[in-house]
Amino acid sequence: MVLRSEILVNKNVMPTAEQALPGRETPMSLPEFHYVFKDTPLLGPFFEGSIDFAIFGLGCFWGAERRFWQREGVVSTVVGYAGGFTPNPTYEEVCSGLTGHTEVVLVVFDKDKVSYRELLAMFWELHNPTQGMRQGNDVGTQYRSAIYCTSPQQLEEAKASRDAFQAELNKAGYGEITTEIDQAPTVYFAEAYHQQYLAKNPDGYCGIGGTGVCLPPSLQGN
């Protein structure tokens, strides 16, 4: 049996539900509006376009969120924690390795302007999905690669794009993709200061970086 004290030393070990921190019932307080999109409610309601949601984990959520809010067709972004056990965790608890969560970006997008396949292409190309419980210099379960799908169609498209990107990675000499692909669990939103962090702190840390491998244009959903 792995003890909590041992997990604190080795953050590459996923805790069990019994080992995870208990968390709390109260969610984090969030600002009403998106810091970048100004008049757009952070969590809706969204009245324009054909709205859908995507959930991606690709390392530190500060840099990941910025890349997605810069994409045309994205109408809102929120960062949070998902895939673990602890309800409504704090950032410090997630960093301890004792929640099981990974850092994620909830992407709200207009399907008439950007497709899920296009967002998947961004996801694969923005980070290295072969690194297991780390992303670059950021090490731990909270930095693992993940796609959490909000519909059966998203799940099918995510797996198909993974297989296509794996073929391209193989050509470039990379290993196997370790990205977790599953139905969407509960996303616990991160503290207010994390939301749109790099818009508030332009010189802040951003550890996101891809492999240089790209999907063929025919598979990018353009």
Swiss-Prot record:
Q: Does Membrane show up as a keyword for this record?
A: no
Which reaction is this enzyme known to catalyze?
Answer: L-methionyl-[protein] + [thioredoxin]-disulfide + H2O = L-methionyl-(S)-S-oxide-[protein] + [thioredoxin]-dithiol; [thioredoxin]-disulfide + L-methionine + H2O = L-methionine (S)-S-oxide + [thioredoxin]-dithiol
In the UniProt record, does the keyword Heme occur? no
Q: What is its EC number?
A: 1.8.4.11
Identify the enzyme class: oxidoreductase
Stated family: Belongs to the MsrA Met sulfoxide reductase family.
Q: What is this protein called?
A: Peptide methionine sulfoxide reductase MsrA
